């Protein structure tokens, strides 16, 4: 499968506080082999800087239209440059990359748990689970109401519960508070977000539920060659970009 692609930007719009959605025409990408939880590594050219590509998870993959959608936050120099890109601009990407969420054996009921910029990859996963007959419940955590995005997209998958840190919408606190409050029924948990959130879910459910956690780490090459994104697991150090970003519940040791 070809990994380097020049994709045409179709849309690049602000959808929430410091949060953008970008649509990309991906004629050369093999959508059949694209797994939920995969990411693309984006090259941003601006006088030769920044040097490193930016890893961004895939929010939505439309095989029929050959369109990829990503959601990103304006958090630094590289992503700020991305906000200036316009429809018709060409974006060089490496991908799809990483080991995504397994969906061969789908559960009867799934719980999707996302925090902040960890929310986007769960949507493509939820679509595929729903289409296979799984009951999907989503718990999404944001800093505040102004930071919320794509709620209607997730509502097409099933029940959605929201937490905000300041209590401006939904449950005040974190996703773990919303889970405790609503107590959704599920067989398998799928989550992506800050490591502190993933650890809390790991501690709560390992040995009790099946689950998969997608980790966010700083990356360089995106293909496992540079060893810049190592993570501790019970089987030793692993590369988030290649062996992950998705790991089984209980696999990461958080050392």
List where the protein language model places each region:
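Ferredoxin-reductase
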Residues: 2-87
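Structural signal for conserved beta-strand scaffold positions within catalytic alpha/beta enzyme cores
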Residues: 11, 60, 162-164, 213-215, ...
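Short, surface-exposed secondary-structure boundary micro-motifs
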Residues: 45-47, 96, 234
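Short, Lys/Arg- and Gly-enriched loop/turn segments at beta-strand edges
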Residues: 47-56, 98-105, 241
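Local cysteine-cluster metal-coordination motifs and their immediate loop/turn environment
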Residues: 121, 216-245
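Short microdomains enriched in Cys/His and/or Lys/Arg
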Residues: 243-255
């Amino acid at each position: 499968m070809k990994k380097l692609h020049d994709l045409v930007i179709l849309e690049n719009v602000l959808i929430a506080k410091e949060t953008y959605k970008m649509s990309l025409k991906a004629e050369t990408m093999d959508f059949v082999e694209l797994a939920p939880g995969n990411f693309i590594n984006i090259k941003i050219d601006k006088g030769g800087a920044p040097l490193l590509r930016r890893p961004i998870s895939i929010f939505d993959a439309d095989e029929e239209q050959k369109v990829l959608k990503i959601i990103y936050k304006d958090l630094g120099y590289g992503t700020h440059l991305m906000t200036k890109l316009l429809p018709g601009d060409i974006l060089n990407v490496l991908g799809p990359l990483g080991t995504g969420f397994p969906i061969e054996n789908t559960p009867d009921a799934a719980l999707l748990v996302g925090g902040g910029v960890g929310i986007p990859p769960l949507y493509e996963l939820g679509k595929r689970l729903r289409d296979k007959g799984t009951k999907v419940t989503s718990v999404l955590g944001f800093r505040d109401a102004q930071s919320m995005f794509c709620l209607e997209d997730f509502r097409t998958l099933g029940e959605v519960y929201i937490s905000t840190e300041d209590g401006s919408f939904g449950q005040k606190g974190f996703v773990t508070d919303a889970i405790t409050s609503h107590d959704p029924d599920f067989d398998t948990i799928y989550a992506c977000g800050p490591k502190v959130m993933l650890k809390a879910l790991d501690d709560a459910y390992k040995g009790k539920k099946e689950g998969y956690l997608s980790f966010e780490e700083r990356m360089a090459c995106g293909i496992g060659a540079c060893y810049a994104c190592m993570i501790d697991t019970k089987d030793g150090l692993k590369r988030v970009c290649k062996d992950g970003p998705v790991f089984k519940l209980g696999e990461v040791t958080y050392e």
